[in-house]
Amino acid sequence: MSPSKMNATVGSTSEVEQKIRQELALSDEVTTIRRNAPAAVLYEDGLKENKTVISSSGALIAYSGVKTGRSPKDKRIVEEPTSKDEIWWGPVNKPCSERTWSINRERAADYLRTRDHIYIVDAFAGWDPKYRIKVRVVCARAYHALFMTNMLIRPTEEELAHFGEPDFTVWNAGQFPANLHTQDMSSKSTIEINFKAMEMIILGTEYAGEMKKGIFTVMFYLMPVHHNVLTLHSSANQGIQNGDVTLFFGLSGTGKTTLSADPHRLLIGDDEHCWSDHGVFNIEGGCYAKCINLSAEKEPEIFDAIKFGSVLENVIYDEKSHVVDYDDSSITENTRCAYPIDYIPSAKIPCLADSHPKNIILLTCDASGVLPPVSKLTPEQVMYHFISGYTSKMAGTEQGVTEPEPTFSSCFGQPFLALHPIRYATMLATKMSQHKANAYLINTGWTGSSYVSGGKRCPLKYTRAILDSIHDGSLANETYETLPIFNLQVPTKVNGVPAELLNPAKNWSQGESKYRGAVTNLANLFVQNFKIYQDRATPDVLAAGPQFE
């Protein structure tokens, strides 16, 4: 294909492109618009940006600038009549006025119209055709366009030709700051969602994950409110032999992506799902895996997915060979790779299951080390721990976090929730009861002692052995003992896992009496956190929390 033919194909003035030109008042002579450009073209443009290179394995290495993680304190929801009575207002969803929205939207448009290249990505969120939404992303960095091309569900040529008007539009002008003096602003970054306009704007942060998580919040609103479909911060996979579905709940860094990428099971998705009356479907068309300390030995499927078409974010590489040093966290602990889900050999395409979950896994990364590697949960304990959403905030997943911090994140996804946590928890309880799902709490964090006191991270091979025993049914038939205070049921034996690892009260490095003090401290944090929910929780759920003698 000749250069002129290629340019005509990629940057031609389609109806969509013409609409964007008119909306942004773009010059035909100055600005090139690329709609759903292929990876090779986005590589070509991306490599013109400072520091962007190709890794030795073929991935595009890009950098997000100052912000290398999400900025949850800068998230805003526009307070407007159609959604204000549904939104869970507070620290998670801070309101901004429609006037502030208009100012910032125009500021984003002003910036975009100064660019010589604008990228449009038209794609879908949600694999179930009954519930999917059409998403349009408008941005000025090729890296952002490739990222969202990977993370959304890519349309066929026919679907793209008949795409029509989007259901939701993202305007990403992240290279340009918000005006700190504008009402409702707390910094020069803002991520604003307007459910009336069905649009999102991004200013003051180039971290690509803001686009992905913004769409997630949109689905946390649209699916329950308009379709009675439960949106979940979870990964999901399905047994090849019998089709059993497992959901993994957990915050960033707890192991959702790693544990759901299992060569013995089909991957439905690694992060964002919906549970409808028909089964489970993935929201995304790609995976956004953490890369810190990545190795081919520990995580071969993720390692092998880092190839042409993938985006590596904020990694360090050898300048001569372009081999990435995945152990180097000098830019951030939150190094990431975004790749299409079909780069995982065991991915199930389309990414949905017409059966309901058999096993529910609540993942926590406990930096205190007092929770066991695995415990079986009663239905009431599931609700208590789902609403609590305890984990340790892992280094790098947010700005300023450099070592694990204990935190509670309701529904294991509090930064992304649009509605009150009790609404999601009630929907989950109903679905688990209807479909008789089993539930387990798995700690992928520290064991033997706390992070501070020299405890060790639970080896991945043991966590995988625990999951194998859940999936083959053997764990359900083991003998259990009760862990004090939390009253968790802990197995005395798990195939492939050292018995001394299973009960933290017995393997605590400072002795069992010191363990009791540590577990009491964590239990007090649980009780304190749950006070904000106790007026709406049932007595059975309250009784499923820590009990002090």
From Swiss-Prot:
Pathway: Carbohydrate biosynthesis; gluconeogenesis. PROSITE patterns: PEPCK_ATP (PS00532). It catalyses: oxaloacetate + ATP = phosphoenolpyruvate + ADP + CO2. GO terms for cellular component: cytosol. GO terms for biological process: gluconeogenesis. It is an enzyme of class 4 (lyase). It holds the Pfam family PEPCK_ATP. Keywords: ATP-binding, Decarboxylase, Gluconeogenesis, Lyase, Nucleotide-binding. This is Phosphoenolpyruvate carboxykinase (ATP).
